[in-house]
């Protein structure tokens, strides 16, 4: 059995060792450990391997909290002490910036982190009927598999949501559409918890009674979605608490639907918004752009400063709700929202929006390379970039520095998803 010394973690939280110049990626191994491993896939330049035995453990190794860890794909790092996870993600960010973009920030910001358990306020859970038993499986997919993990509880979900996993199995198994249920979305707000069920066929009266009884027993709200995301509607109860989240520091509340993108981790999102605003430093006299603005998670806090803000987003539905949130929070006079496909941005289309003193960019995983390449002679003097993919951040940062003349002032990791390999980050760029 081959033995290796683990050097570091890759972007999927696999340990990396080397044998005769070839990289070996070992599931479950931690930096500094000496391990036995067994390769299950061999390529000319690398191998993928399973961990067989830890000969010399890392001081960061801990016993996983969850009995499903190692099978369930919802987490990848429970065997690593939480502060060590954050440090590893900071290193992944630094490595990505250098190896992909060939750039380094002048300063590394301290990472943003929060509670490691019960943080996941939004989740899409897979559902499948088990033909032999007639029961249902509900949970995340197994590690690198299309199968659904047989989980009875989940430590990264809020406790009251984890407690719904088994009752949901019983509910879905009893529905006439049980065979055709593929997933259920969970969205936790300040005042209520919503479950969203995609239905391809109409519910029977008996199905509707079962859903209503489940709601009454478990204090949740059920949404149904017969077709695309815009068809989702609140099924039961028709009234009651709204699904919303708050940014108390800015006196803001955002209503949303289970189909809307919102940050998974409410506590870390509050810290992230606070840091983004501190780094952006909006002033009442400034005109600021919030690109990929979504519901206005950053737009409305910027508007609280008195600056004039333009929020740009590709989804007309999100822009509509952003306008509603601005009005509900008394900020309609400070905010303008517009619909634009920022993945097809040109210098001409960006210039048509007018001159901006500063810009905040919060793109999806694909990044914002078209947008940053479109920045012309009236470039914003400061850009704060919130990223959910270190690779595309590194690519876009290289464009800003080498092609657009920005200084790469600072960057730091954001641990939005504890116990996973997912790395979010925030970066600041300034013109000299």
Swiss-Prot record:
Which species is listed as the source? Dechloromonas aromatica (strain RCB)
Its biological function? Catalyzes the formation of 5-methyl-uridine at position 1939 (m5U1939) in 23S rRNA.
Q: Of which family is this protein a member?
A: Belongs to the class I-like SAM-binding methyltransferase superfamily. RNA M5U methyltransferase family. RlmD subfamily.
* Enzyme Commission number(s): 2.1.1.190
Residue positions of the active site: 388 (nucleophile)
The record's section on PANTHER family has:
23S RRNA (URACIL(1939)-C(5))-METHYLTRANSFERASE RLMD, RNA M5U METHYLTRANSFERASE
Residues binding [4Fe-4S] cluster, per UniProt: 66, 72, 75, 154
Family annotation (InterPro entries): 23S_rRNA_MeTrfase_RlmD (IPR001566), MeTrfase_TrmA_AS (IPR030390), MeTrfase_TrmA_CS (IPR030391), NA-bd_OB-fold (IPR012340), SAM-dependent_MTases_sf (IPR029063), U5_MeTrfase_fam (IPR010280)
| Gene coding for it | rlmD
Pfam families per UniProt: tRNA_U5-meth_tr
Identify the keywords attached in UniProt to this record, alphabetized.
4Fe-4S, Iron, Iron-sulfur, Metal-binding, Methyltransferase, rRNA processing, S-adenosyl-L-methionine, Transferase
The reaction(s) this protein catalyses? uridine(1939) in 23S rRNA + S-adenosyl-L-methionine = 5-methyluridine(1939) in 23S rRNA + S-adenosyl-L-homocysteine + H(+)
Molecular function terms from GO? 4 iron, 4 sulfur cluster binding; iron ion binding; RNA binding; rRNA (uridine-C5-)-methyltransferase activity
Annotated NCBIfam families? PRK13168.1 (NF009639)
Q: Which HAMAP family match?
A: 23SrRNA_methyltr_RlmD (MF_01010)
Q: Where does S-adenosyl-L-methionine bind?
A: 263, 292, 297, 313, 341, 362
What EC class does the entry list? transferase
According to UniProt, the name of this protein is 23S rRNA (uracil(1939)-C(5))-methyltransferase RlmD
**Which GO BP annotation is one of this protein's?**
rRNA base methylation
Q: Which residue ranges does the record assign to the TRAM domain?
A: 1-53
